């Protein structure tokens, strides 16, 4: 039976952070809502531990798994992690979010190991702006996207976080790029997670005006019911999804996600770190699968109807 919280929301998606390490320094990164580790106390789950938790989640009828970070591809054993998850019967949608800088190197072996698709974070198509925002090389990301498309990590999704006064004039360019590469564009509104208040106030902008223009051009508008009711605009040559942050009432109302932090804690809410459920310690102390299942159920019981701030 599908896991449901006390408010009737099914839990269908598992996001597994495999590391908090990253090879970029993006000023806007929210790290999946995870707090930075105490210096010298970095804990990461092993490939076997990650696979075991995914297997238990699948037994609870969670079918969609996404690997996140940090940057998943900085883990030297990332292909092993992907391979172990890829062998689990019952995983329907298996994807990864990456900054793309190492994707050209890993795309083929990840696909062969069982990864189905990737989301690539790409806030801009301008080399100088990309370098300023992330400290990285845009060429590496573009090469990674091209390689992901070539090997069949389909569909490739492009995550464009829209920042006021920085890249909000590039949306049309990014739509054209998505059309040219055969990718799906996701426009993402800045969220106030792990960010200084002044940064959020300075760079946040609503996406409502983009949605008005997208609706005018769309051949069809689709609503993804189990993905925060986000809207998908089918344009003549591209597909664009619009992702609003936590202030959007649909965000919590239709949340179907459970997260696992890189140090092995179940995270019921993206915005909170005061209701985590530790599963790594019990696993390392010999807990059975049934006992870990009960910890999953406890995490789901801790889900609230909405984030209260």
Residues of each region from the PLM?
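Generic start-of-chain signal for non-secretory N-termini
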Residues: 1-4
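Residue-level signature of catalytic and energy-coupling elements of molecular machines
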Residues: 18, 185, 264
